[in-house]
Amino acid sequence: MEFNQDNRSFCTTVAVLDTVAEQLADVDLTLPDYCPDIEKILKCTLIPKIQTRTLSGGQLQIDGNCVVNVLYVDSIKKSIRCCEQSVNFSQSFSVKEAPDNPVILTRTKPEYINCRALSPRRLVMHGAFSLYAKVLSSAKTSIYSPPAENCLEAQLMNIKCASLTSLCQEQFSVVEEVSVGDKPVIESILSTDISVNITDTKAVTGKLMANGEINLKLLYITDVESGETGKLDYLLPFNQIIDCEGIDENTINCVSCDIMSYDIRLKNDVMSDKPLLLLDLKLCLTEEGYVIADENVVTDAYSVKCATQPAFTQLNIVSDLAKLNDSHIEKSSVAVDNGKISKVINISSNQITADYSCDDKGITVSGKVNICILAENEDKIPVFIERNIDYSHLMTSSSEYNCALYVEPRVASISYRLADDSTVEIRCEIKFAVSAAAKENIRAVSDVEIFEDKPVKPEECALTLYFAQAGESLWSIAKSHNTALDKLIEENSAAAQNEDISRMPVSYTHLRAHETLSDL
């Protein structure tokens, strides 16, 4: 038997691709003529940068370049120098079900790099990094509705259900000329650390306005002859408006922003003898917009007239969403393996990982922070110390949530003090932006098969008196005896269908052959 039903559904994100591939980086580097010979290598770093991402014809194509940065001590002045070389990479992934408006998420993670010196001016390096790729699309999940005809008894559960109304992504560039101001002139850049943070979002119909800030930290050479170094910490605010179909003032927005690639060059300034920094970043902003509404989900159903067989499914419901921002202080002591430290030149972090777990207390974010210390030993020779520090942080006000859509950690600041001539005490401030969600799995009815050829046999008596057992409810009694739930509630003055009625006598009348539910 088929009935007319109201089609109800909610929308969620679904990953049509979620994979990772290893990319190799092989570099044969010869120093330019203006660079002095290498006496000691301090640090080799892989910096993957993604330039383009395209999805066409069932293939996701990702192209970019990997910068290999070498920090070393020169053989003449025993000062810190830097050289780098870039190699291109390309990777394609097969996407079986390519969506019409996909959202592409990518990230890279350096794995290792090995360096071998063939001469004081030539290095051969072999490294690898992981390229993570995910493609998101939207998918509808149907919610079963009982037929309009009054022939089924349905057990309903009222829930909060978040439905995806917008899923959009936009790439954009931020170009800025940065002046060092009253700081020493920049002659050569040694290392760069860039992070991005979304500070505020506002939605109007069809548009999302995002405000954020870019934090640029530089270590550079101020005088090539003396080898003196300087540091720059620059905060650049930005704003961007992107088109988002389905977004409005009532949408709960989960927004993330990633740095795909960046380029920093020195540029002569006609107004000053100090060169400017030309900063060119390519950012990618991703938005998931949700609207939370009340829904009545059918968790069980039966007919008072015919035999029935309900089919069940698991509904994955998001009942609440929130953007959580928090900070964490991680303290650690780093000891030098050999020798002593006379001076700390710079402390930075070039990598931070994050994962999350959930329990009754809330969402805990944990991972590792890579700490890089550039210092001088007792002989005034530069040394490099690298450590991975574990951290774990319970997000504030997260006890109501059991899932995270996005976890974005960043190292906001690092301070230190020399505890003694071989130990550095570090204080690292980590800031988190977490898009938290409360997820539920509900066993719900997906369809009900009604067997008209198997009618319910009428009871021979006019009244049944039933003594409820422990754990029974009016619903379970009504279903097992094929009687109308509303009538059972009315006759027994029960407050609700799930009220505990253990050891209570329950009575109900039966339909005669010529009666209908409306006659009772």
Predicted regions: what is each one?
Residues M1-A470, W475-S493:
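C-terminal beta-sandwich interaction modules and adjacent acidic
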Residues T509-T516:
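Conserved small/polar residues in nucleotide/adenosyl-binding loops
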